[in-house]
């Protein structure tokens, strides 16, 4: 984010104040950029494992993603709490309504909803059992519900970092959890259009494009996706 680049000013004004930089998800290139932007070249770097062995990853391509997601939920999580991520607000609303019609408690969450509605839906998700929250990426920051048993993506995430961060909201209690995703060509075209229409400079757009291509590569992989996911963050699967 552009604002982060201005943080170096604090060090220039207060050079004797100790600093620490923390991030939950960053590949090597991003870590190098953080170090450079914050002028932390002499700092020590500590990296914990990215592996979440209790999460099972599944990625599905094909028609009728909504029906395939419903089959996944019914077969694996008929009474469990979960998160369904969608790319657009319209898709969030439609998916929450559809899941409700199927008999599940499904609540929408996106930035276009009134704040009181977002807070109410968030609190119900945190306090009640078996609630499914259907959301854009506006949902999740600071949310800590240990017993989320599944995270489903009905839209392709924009990067592996985003995918890892969003799926990482499942199974925080250490118990088995599922990360399920459906994707299609339209998702790729939509995300590319978003990137092309953004106000970012061309260098940033190239980085975002490369991240999307890496995400697409993970989807199309026929080998172990956990191994590829860890490899993206420069970690070998033991």
For the regions a language model picked out, list residue spans one by one.
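Cys/His-rich short segments
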Residues: 211, 216, 220-238
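Helicase motor core with emphasis on the C-terminal RecA-like subdomain
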Residues: 1-202, 207-210, 234-238
């Amino acid at each position: 984010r552009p604002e982060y680049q201005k943080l170096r000013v604090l060090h220039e004004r207060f050079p004797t104040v100790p600093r620490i930089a923390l991030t939950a998800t960053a590949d090597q290139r991003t870590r190098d950029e953080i170090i450079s932007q914050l002028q932390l070249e002499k700092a020590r770097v500590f990296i914990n494992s990215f592996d979440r062995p209790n999460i099972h990853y599944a990625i599905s391509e094909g028609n009728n993603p909504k029906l395939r997601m419903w089959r996944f939920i019914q077969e694996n999580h008929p009474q469990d709490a979960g998160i369904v991520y969608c790319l657009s607000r319209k898709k969030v609303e439609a998916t929450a309504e559809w899941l409700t019609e199927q008999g599940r408690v499904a609540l929408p969450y996106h930035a276009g909803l009134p704040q009181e509605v977002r807070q109410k839906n968030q609190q119900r998700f945190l306090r009640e059992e078996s609630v499914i929250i259907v959301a854009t990426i506006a949902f999740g920051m600071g949310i800590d519900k240990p017993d989320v048993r599944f995270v489903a993506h009905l839209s392709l995430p924009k990067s592996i970092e985003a995918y890892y961060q969003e799926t990482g909201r499942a199974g925080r209690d250490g118990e088995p959890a599922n990360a399920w995703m459906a994707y299609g060509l339209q998702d790729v075209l939509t995300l590319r259009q978003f990137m092309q229409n953004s106000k970012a400079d061309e260098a940033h757009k190239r980085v975002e494009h490369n991240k999307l291509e890496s995400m697409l590569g993970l989807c199309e992989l026929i080998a172990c996706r956990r191994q590829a996911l860890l490899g993206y963050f420069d970690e070998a699967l033991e």
